[in-house]
C-alpha cells in the first residue's frame, strides 16, 4: 500500500486550520474564565483613557 504524500497546498491548509483552531480555543478559554487578558496594576504609569457616551434628551426633543 502506497503512502499518500500531501501537496504544498494541503500542508498549508492544515497548518492554517491548526492556527485558527488554537486561536479559537484560546478565545473560548478567556471568555469562559471572564478574566481580562491584560491586568492593569494601580501603579501603572500609563494613563487610561475612558470614553463615555451620554445621550442628552434635550437635543432629541427639538
Curated annotation (Swiss-Prot):
Annotated Gene Ontology cellular components are:
apical plasma membrane
What is its membrane topology? Single-pass type II membrane protein
A GO molecular function assigned to this protein is: oligo-1,6-glucosidase activity
Topology check: give the Cytoplasmic ranges. 2-12
Q: In the Enzyme Commission scheme, what number(s) does this protein have?
A: 3.2.1.48, 3.2.1.10
- Which interval of the chain is the signal sequence? none
Q: Transmembrane stretches, by residue range?
A: 13-32
Question: What UniProt keywords apply to this chain's record, in alphabetical order?
Answer: Cell membrane, Glycosidase, Hydrolase, Membrane, Multifunctional enzyme, Phosphoprotein, Repeat, Signal-anchor, Sulfation, Transmembrane, Transmembrane helix
Reply yes or no: does the keyword rRNA processing apply.
Answer: no
Q: Which residues lie on this side of the membrane: Lumenal?
A: 33-38
Q: Which reaction does it catalyse?
A: Hydrolysis of sucrose and maltose by an alpha-D-glucosidase-type action; Hydrolysis of (1->6)-alpha-D-glucosidic linkages in some oligosaccharides produced from starch and glycogen by alpha-amylase, and in isomaltose
Protein's name in the database: Sucrase-isomaltase, intestinal
- Please report the organism this UniProt entry assigns to the protein: Sus scrofa (Pig)
Q: Please state the gene responsible for encoding this protein.
A: SI
Amino acid at each position: 500500500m502506497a503512502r499518500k504524500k500531501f501537496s504544498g497546498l494541503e500542508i498549508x491548509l492544515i497548518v492554517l486550520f491548526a492556527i485558527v483552531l488554537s486561536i479559537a480555543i484560546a478565545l473560548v478559554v478567556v471568555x469562559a474564565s471572564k478574566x481580562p487578558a491584560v491586568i492593569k496594576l494601580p501603579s501603572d504609569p500609563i494613563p487610561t483613557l475612558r470614553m463615555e457616551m451620554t445621550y442628552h434628551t434635550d437635543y432629541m426633543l427639538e
